[in-house]
UniProtKB/Swiss-Prot annotation:
This is Spermatogenesis-associated protein 21. Keywords: Calcium, Coiled coil, Metal-binding. CDD domains: EFh. InterPro entries: EF-hand-dom_pair, EF_Hand_1_Ca_BS, EF_hand_dom, SPT21. It comes from Macaca fascicularis.
Length: 696
């Protein structure tokens, strides 16, 4: 047990027998005043030369290592690849620097293990036989052969005895490839005997000729001598490529002292590439080892970013479609309000969704593709695969939005139908009025009908008014019209649409009230107005009357007919204008009869209201100034400004009275409140008897 402890401490480890190293543990001790360690750069704290010399003397004199944390305090964690390049300060002049020639077998083995741990095969392989020739004992040769066999199987696997603070690495993210170690076997990695081996680090400091040691930061030297390193297990960077995916095969090995040590041998694997073993390439292992993880994280973030971009793109497309449909619906409602008779039904089918992005797979949920027939739609809470960035869960919400819009459109249709229902009685009344007028127009007497037939025969056509006969009459009356205007007049006169203007069509045109009033307005406006094809026959008739081209009885019948029509038409026109005005008001503003009454109140109604108020308030409220009759009828010479001004106090009231008024007239209207009720009552009794005599 003493030999094991001695070998453990001399090997520069901080392993306590009986404790099992935790493979994923990485301990970095930070204190105030200590500068942070840059990844890939190791800081090794060394004591003074005198302190190192004293410790070496103590260790060589006692034949064993120093006990306790003093020896361990001089080391600090650092990457294992930089420990091979460190150069320790020279010892005192009396001390001899260590060389590759071993003082004892354990020193050479330790140096070999250090070199094999760092993967420096090109520098060590040729030197291996020379070191073996210098060994004096067969036991040491046997240990070297055993070590070479182990190196041949996995030369990059560091021994368990070297897994201490001297070989501590800051690669915390490689804890998953740490090889398991048995708790009580410090020298089991190479099967070395536990007996006569003296430590190399405890005796003479090992020289690292390639690089000078970094200067420790101020304050770090004092703190490094007081820190105790907990047990931890690390792996050299070479194990990442050689044994990260190969399990170790532990096996029992008999040592010289009779103890049984577990030998951990990795499975044979390919050698690491030379650029990994290169010292210049391994100065920043954290960056090199973090590179495989960055693409994975970048790929994950890129996928998430693509998913978010696809989601936002679909969301914006949904919003654009919804806004466009909303604008179309608004325009449709505006057109429906302008022309309520031409309402178009709302399509009940839901609108087609926009095309999904190219990243989304073609096989999506059936309810996402509304146009294509398929199985029943999935529920709202159905799970969607994470690899599809198409936001299919937004479709039910969009459907709900369309339902709301349909409901709003239906509500607008209801309001329009209600307004239309209110307008229908007025329109029906107008239609009835037109029908009654047409019935009255159709009811012609025999004399009136004979008079219009005689006018029809003037055109001298073959039983109808044709283009040639109409053109001849127009030329006779002095009208200059084009053939196109003649054709338009004939087409307008063809009421039944058979292509011929017979007497029935001619009679319907001449008895049409609208055409008659249109011709009257056209003649009243200006004589230079262009000829209207719809009223061309009415324009010819007055000229015939002036020329006395018709018999006197015919002219009298036609003249009387149109005079009655004009008189009845003016009254009906007024009624029509009033009805049309009411319709326009109902379309713009709701009809309120009380508002119309309040806007136009007749004078008699105002007087009746005043008399009613006077009768109600005269008896109980005689003292109130508002119940008293004003002095306007009794004072015709009073100034208008005085009358309009409201009397506020007795001084103003006295000024308002003219000096011509008698005191008995002034007293009942401008009496002070300080007078008694008796005097007021006596004066008020005198007023009704005097008013009728003066007003009549």
């Amino acid at each position: 047990m003493d030999n094991r402890n001695t070998q453990m401490y001399t090997e520069g480890r901080i392993k306590v027998p009986g404790t099992q190293p935790s493979p994923g543990l990485r301990i970095t001790i930070k204190r105030a005043g200590v500068e942070p360690t840059i990844p890939g750069v190791s800081q090794v704290m060394f004591p003074d030369a005198s302190e190192v010399g004293s410790r070496k003397q103590l260790s060589s004199a006692s034949g064993g290592p120093e006990k306790g944390p003093r020896y361990r305090d001089t080391f600090k964690e650092g990457p294992s690849e930089l420990r091979t390049q460190e150069q320790r300060p020279p010892a005192k002049p009396g001390k001899k620097q260590s060389s590759w020639v071993p003082q004892e077998g354990s020193q050479e083995l330790q140096a070999g293990q250090d070199q094999s741990e760092l993967g420096l095969l090109p520098s060590w392989v040729p030197e291996g036989p020379e070191g073996l020739q210098q060994l004096g004992s067969g036991k040491e040769i046997e240990g070297q052969q055993r070590r070479q066999r182990n190196r041949g199987t996995g030369e990059d696997e560091p021994p368990e005895s070297c897994q201490g603070p001297g070989y501590q690495s800051t690669l915390g993210h490689q804890a998953d490839v740490v090889q398991p170690a048995e708790p009580c076997c410090p020298l089991a990695g190479r099967g070395q005997p536990l007996g006569d081996k003296r430590p190399k680090e405890a005796d003479v400091p090992h020289i690292r000729p390639q690089e000078a040691p970094p200067e420790p930061s101020p304050g770090a030297h004092g703190d490094s001598s007081q820190e105790a390193m907990p047990p931890t297990s690390t792996v050299a960077p070479e194990e990442k490529t050689a044994s990260s995916f190969l399990p170790s095969m532990p096996g029992p090995t008999k040592t010289k002292g009779g103890g049984e040590a577990v030998e951990t041998q990795p499975a044979p694997g390919p050698l690491p590439p030379p650029e990994v073993r290169d010292i210049g390439e391994r100065r920043e292992p954290d960056r090199v080892q973090q590179q495989p993880q960055k693409p994975v994280v970048a790929a994950g973030t890129q996928n998430l970013r693509k998913f978010r971009q696809g989601f936002m793109k679909c969301l914006l497309e949904m919003e654009k479609v919804e806004a466009s449909h909303r604008r179309a619906l608004k325009a449709r409602s505006l057109t429906a309000q302008k022309s309520p008779r031409t309402l178009t039904p709302v399509p009940t089918s839901s609108p087609s969704l926009p095309q999904t992005p190219a990243s989304a797979p073609a096989s999506g949920p059936s309810w996402a593709r509304l146009s294509a027939p398929g199985p029943e739609p999935a529920p709202v809470g159905a799970s969607v695969p994470t690899s599809t960035p198409c936001p299919v869960l937004l479709c039910p919400a969009l459907d709900l939005g369309w339902r709301r819009m349909e409901l709003s459109h239906h509500s607008s249709e209801r309001t329009l139908s209600y307004a239309k229902a209110r307008q229908e009685p007025e329109e029906q009344s107008l239609q009835k009025l037109y029908q009654n007028r047409e019935k009255s127009e159709e009811q012609l007497t025999l004399k009136q009908e004979e008079a219009f037939r005689s006018y029809f025969e003037i055109f001298n056509g073959p039983g109808e008014v044709d283009a040639q006969s109409l053109k001849n009459i127009l030329l006779l009356m002095g009208f200059s019209v084009t053939p196109a205007q003649v054709e338009d007049a004939l087409m307008s006169a063809d009421v039944n649409g058979d292509g011929h203007v017979d007497f029935k069509d001619f009679l319907a045109v001449m008895t049409d009230t609208r055409r008659f009033f249109c011709s009257v307005e056209q003649n009243a406006l200006t004589d230079m107005a262009p000829h209207n094809p719809h009223t061309l026959l009415f324009e010819i008739l007055p000229l015939l009357v002036e020329m006395l081209a018709l018999p006197e009885a015919v002219l009298e019948e036609i003249t009387n007919y149109y005079q009655k029509k004009l008189k009845a038409g003016t009254c009906k026109a007024q009624e029509m204008e009033a009805a049309i005005g009411r319709l326009r008001l109902q379309k713009q503003l709701p009809y309120n009869p009380q508002q119309e009454e309040s806007s136009e109140v007749p004078e008699r109604k105002v007087l009746s209201i005043l008399s009613r108020l006077k009768q109600q308030n005269y008896a109980p409220n005689l003292q109130s100034p508002y119940a008293q009759v004003p002095c306007i009828p009794l004072c015709p010479r009073m100034d208008k400004k005085m009358v309009r001004r409201k009397p506020t106090n007795h001084y103003v009231q006295d000024q308002c009275t003219t000096p011509g008024l008698a005191p008995d007239i002034r007293s009942p209207f401008f009496q002070s409140r300080s007078q008694g009720n008796r005097e007021h009552n006596s004066d008020s009794r005198k007023w009704p008897s005097s008013v009728p005599s003066r007003t009549h």
